[in-house]
Amino acid sequence: MAFMEKPPAGKVLLDDTVPLTAAVEASQSLQSHTEYIIRVQRGISAENSWQIVRRYSDFDLLNNSLQITGLSLPLPPKKLIGNMDREFIAERQRGLQNYLNVIMANHVLSNCELLKKFLDPNNYSANYTEIALQQVSMFFRSEPKWEVVEPLKDIGWRIRKKYFLMKIKNQPKERLVLSWADLGPDKYLSDKDFQCLIKLLPSCVHPYIYRVTFATASESSALLIRAFNEKGTLKDLIYKAKPKDPFLKKYCNPKKTQGLELQQIKTYGRQILEALKFLHDKGFPYGHLHAANVMLDGNTCRLLDLENSLLGLPSFYRSYFTQFRKINTLESVDVHCFGHLLYEMTYGRPPDSVPVDSFPPASSLAVVAVLESTLSCEACKNGMPTVSRLLQMPLFSDVLLTTSEKPQFKIPTKLKEALRIAKECIEKRLTEEQKQIHQHRRLTRAQSHHGSEEERKRRKILARKKSKRSAVENSEEQPVKHSNSNNSAGSGASSPLTSPSSPTPPSTAGLSSALPPPPPPPPPPPPPAGPSPTSATEMPAPFLPQPVNGVNRGALLSSIQNFQKGTLRKAQTCDHSAPKIG
């Protein structure tokens, strides 16, 4: 079986869903304007970063381009006089940073081509509309029956996927949509298997999968034609949008959104799950479910864009499920994405963040139960249910589907094996990315905790306690060392001093074993009548501090016990205190 693990040599396949972060690091004032130096980073690796220089006019141009969204973005206002003042520049720099933060926090805006070109001009300088037109023109040379009516500009969210309204020359009233897409970072099929599978898509027949009229592929891209649907997608229904409008205008800040009725949620949800189950049973990887990839045909939902996984394109929700290590298969990705779709169908908008801590009131508790099983903290932490499990839940189990169309999609055994290996490679890249994000998050939390005010206070308290403890230990060691030195000098011992914690064993082994720990010494005898030239070993020395060494104490006690009064010499006293008379 032909199989390719790496993209073609010389071709860089970027994952456009990897978030970009931007930090305005500094500013530099030139003669007539100020430039802002911005550090841009792709993903979590600081090594994958670069600097760009932008003027305020560049930000203003970007902001004007984003007005199509209808969002009120916090771009700092213009200032003609005093705009070179140092304090003003610092304030504007903070404002521009906040502006970038707001844009990058928006899931739709952060993936749009306008922002990518602003932050990463080296990788997004190509005109993909022109590239797509060239590819389509080459296709028309061999297929002259098709004709382009007009380009459908930016109706999708993908940067490297373009759409054109088409017609057949001998059927001028029938409208079709041609989609052209470049390869993505998860393209692991060989060129031969890739082209065969793309051409196999028109043979896929299922009541809940949108039919492909024509499909072909080259070594670097794919081109598919489908019937144009005036009503648009399920997302168009929810957002009250026109299918031909640009993606940013339709979905970024809709004025009117409306959740669906309970019966619609049940029916559409069941239809989508049946389509997913069919693909899973066939071993065909999907991973691209979202409301704009579900065509609404009357009262029937049909999945779109089966070719995306063959092209290796990243999922719309990839930046969400890469945060959760338990969502590590394409089947679990489909279930998680279904949770996003169900949330939009229920509440008329996407969730503010994922995982969802608490769900707003819904038309049925059965809806909330499915949402909790796919979007809650517990579900994201422990893993997704299967599609079969969702079909058995009360929300969908009692839905009756009536269709006369028999599903069929015959995939040759050789291509099934190619799909299986490609699916494993896609899941492997996902798992590795999740692992890197998890490790980065742990490191970031540790650094944040280490640098927090509470942690700094705790470390100061511990340092003070340790310092006090060391001071107390040092003060206790000083008299012990002093007594050891005095004792060694008084007894004439030649052995070196030792610390109290590790006493040196005595030189005579029998003494330490024969003598138990001695009792306190008895009170000294009364002082003699006069001075005596006795040696120090024959006289008690009560003025010496009690030594802690067991050998010295034993010697002192033995000297006291063996003392004999008779060994003292008699002394004659001459009393000169009487008065002299003479």
Swiss-Prot record:
Family annotation (InterPro entries): Kinase-like_dom_sf, MONaKA_PX, Prot_kinase_dom, PX_dom, PX_dom_sf, SortingNexin/PXDomain-PKLike, WH2_dom
Domain PX: 14-126
Compositionally biased tracts (Low complexity): 483-514
Biased composition (Pro residues): 515-531
Its membrane topology: Peripheral membrane protein
Chain spans, region Disordered: 433-550
Basic residues: compositionally biased ranges: 437-448, 457-469
Subcellular localization: Cytoplasm; Cell membrane
Expression sites by tissue: Isoform 1 is present in all tissues examined. Isoform 2 is found in all tissues except skeletal muscle and very low levels in spleen. Both isoforms are widely expressed throughout the nervous system however levels of isoform 2 are higher in purified hippocampal and cortical neurons whereas glial cells express more isoform 1 than isoform 2.
Positions of the WH2 domain: 548-567
One GO term of the biological process aspect: inflammatory response
Cellular component GO terms held in the UniProt record: centriolar satellite; cytoplasm; cytosol; plasma membrane; protein-containing complex
GO molecular function: actin binding; ATP binding; phosphatidylinositol binding; protein kinase activity
Key words of the record: Actin-binding, Cell membrane, Cytoplasm, Membrane
Domain Protein kinase residues, every copy: 88-481
Pfam families, A to Z: Pkinase, PX, WH2
Protein task: Binds to and modulates brain Na,K-ATPase subunits ATP1B1 and ATP1B3 and may thereby participate in the regulation of electrical excitability and synaptic transmission. May not display kinase activity.
Annotated domain remarks: The protein kinase domain is predicted to be catalytically inactive.
Entry's family note: Belongs to the protein kinase superfamily.
Protein name (Swiss-Prot/TrEMBL): PX domain-containing protein kinase-like protein
Provenance organism: Mus musculus
Lineage of the organism: Eukaryota, Metazoa, Chordata, Craniata, Vertebrata
